[in-house]
Amino acid sequence: MKPVQSRRLAFAALLSLSASCHAATEHWGWIEQSWLMPERMQAKAKLDTGALTSSLDARNIHRYKKDGERWVRFDVVLPTADSKAPVSVTFERKVLRLIKVRGAGGSDSRPVVAMDICLGAKLLREQFSLRDRGNMNYPVLLGRRTLEHLGAVDVSRTFTRKPTCGALAAQ
């Protein structure tokens, strides 16, 4: 085979591989339904490519020490599907780290914890900074560290799939 033909064949193979990989990438809407696991608390999640770390609407945040380690207790308050009284669940998690967030009102130190979240059929263990997001439209914000495990975000779509991690959570 001539060198020019070999290069063309190699280029065509790479182009084909690239196209097939691109087609296999999952696309998600900029708003998706999610479950906080293992409690299966339903929450709307905003997929935000502008944020690095994911954030969770946490109320009554109480930091404490447990066996010499930093822990946090907090409430997650979410509306129910039937729009009746919201449901509140208390979580306790080990603090993985603290992040400092600077804004117009000054700086703020927030705890970061690991949480399991279900999106579509994917069960992910991700890091979330805790903050009272009660004045925000979406209680869960998924940043780039989480989005890299999902796929591309299509800003023209919302609610592309329902959470289906029930069987996965039992494992």
Task: Say what each PLM segment does.
Residues 11-12, 148:
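General helical structural elements
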Residues 18-20:
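N-terminal signal peptide c-region/cleavage motif recognized by signal peptidases
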Residues 23-171:
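Pepsin/retropepsin-fold aspartyl endopeptidases
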